[in-house]
A protein has these predicted regions:
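Short, solvent-exposed loop/turn segments at secondary-structure junctions
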Residues: 9-12, 46-54, 92-96, 127-128, ...
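Short helix-terminating capping/connector loops at secondary-structure junctions
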Residues: 30-33, 80-85, 115-118, 191-194
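Soluble or luminal CAZymes and related metallo-dependent hydrolases
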Residues: 6-10, 36, 61-69, 98, ...
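Conserved RecA-like P-loop NTPase helicase motor core
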Residues: 111, 115-195
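Conserved strand-helix element at the start of the C-terminal RecA-like helicase core
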Residues: 5, 28-40, 82-104
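Coupling/switch/interface segments within P-loop NTPase motor domains and analogous charged loops
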Residues: 15, 61, 65, 71-79, ...
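Inter-lobe connector of SF1/SF2 helicase motors
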Residues: 1-61, 72-75
Length: 195
């Protein structure tokens, strides 16, 4: 189901700014090496994900995709504790790195809501085949209840759907084939959520 979030004041202002940038590019008023539609599209996608990705001076906002995702994940987590059902959060922008990133932000927020750190994992931390196998096995067993990863890291070819109850796309993948990884056979839980 779709989780609709109203635009924040900062996002509205930023969208006005990038609309002006797009018009300048269309009119040829700016060199393509300075600004272009690809940069504008990327900045728009980052802003839609979390305004802090385009303006680091902003504070945490509840009125964002990340804030809503964290609320949804926590609600589902506690509602499905008995069966140890699992969730995937897909995020292609702002993957784990030093400094501010969405993955660490989500993890901190989930921990603050009472989800144990050892039940939250980043697919990016499994940097060998052995670690990937162990991580995915832990997700299938319900030891890891929330896994965050990019479409590339945990999309096509990754089979962790056994206990999967929800998928959360906080940014949209470029390829339609990358959506809907939860709809598989041989699952413990048949009624699932995709947000």
């Amino acid at each position: 189901k779709d989780a609709l979030i109203s635009k924040s004041y900062d996002l509205k202002k930023y969208l006005e700014e990038i609309s002006k940038r797009a018009e300048a590019v269309r009119m040829g008023a700016v060199l393509r090496t300075v600004d272009n539609m690809l940069k504008i599209t990327t900045d728009g996608r980052k802003a839609a994900l979390d305004m802090r990705l385009v303006d680091s001076s902003l504070s945490v906002g509840c009125q964002s995709k990340v804030g809503r995702c964290v609320e949804n994940v926590a609600n589902i987590y506690f509602r499905t504790m008995k069966d140890r059902l699992t969730q995937v959060i897909f995020c292609d922008y702002s993957t784990p790195k030093k400094g501010f990133n969405i993955y660490d932000d989500i993890k901190v927020r989930l921990k603050n809501l009472g989800i144990p750190e050892n039940e939250i994992a980043f697919a990016h931390s499994a940097n060998t085949e052995k670690k990937r196998k162990q991580l995915f096995d832990d997700v299938r067993k319900g030891k890891i209840r929330v896994i965050l990863g990019s479409t590339f890291k945990i999309g096509m070819g990754v089979n962790i759907q056994d206990r999967l109850i929800a998928l959360h796309y906080i940014d949209v993948p470029w390829r339609p084939a990358d959506v809907g990884r939860i709809l598989r056979t041989f699952k413990i839980k048949k009624n699932v959520e995709v947000t």
